[in-house]
Amino acid sequence: MNIIKKIELEQMRLDIPKFKSGDSVKVHMRIVEGEKERIQVFHGNVIRISRGTTNATFTVRKISNGVGVERVFPMHSPFIDRIEVVQQGRVRRSRLYYLRNLKGKAARIKPLKTW
């Protein structure tokens, strides 16, 4: 086995739930401030997933005080405590950049019906 691939497999996290673009997720980040450590939750919709080995990322968008906030998270980051999938969304695209131009109720994502 290639040495680089072996090291990448050791660095990958196996506790990541399956989610896709359009899903509503809560990302629990570990924040270190001086000697203290706390958990900060970022709750929003996944608008983009870039798959790969250890360099996989996903982008989460939320509206905070009327301003759109997007944050890019490395999938296998040691600072991510856990990822919760709150609701699955029904979308037809993998990159939801069009949500940036929508406001209010138009920017909502329909929930996925599971029967």
Curated annotation (Swiss-Prot):
Q: Pfam families attached here? A: Ribosomal_L19
Q: Does the keyword Cell membrane apply?
A: no
Q: Which InterPro entries does the protein's record reference?
A: Ribosomal_bL19, Ribosomal_bL19_CS, Ribosomal_bL19_sf, Translation_prot_SH3-like_sf
Q: Which NCBIfam families match?
A: rplS_bact
- Role according to the record: This protein is located at the 30S-50S ribosomal subunit interface and may play a role in the structure and function of the aminoacyl-tRNA binding site.
Q: Which family does it belong to?
A: Belongs to the bacterial ribosomal protein bL19 family.
Q: What's the protein name?
A: Large ribosomal subunit protein bL19
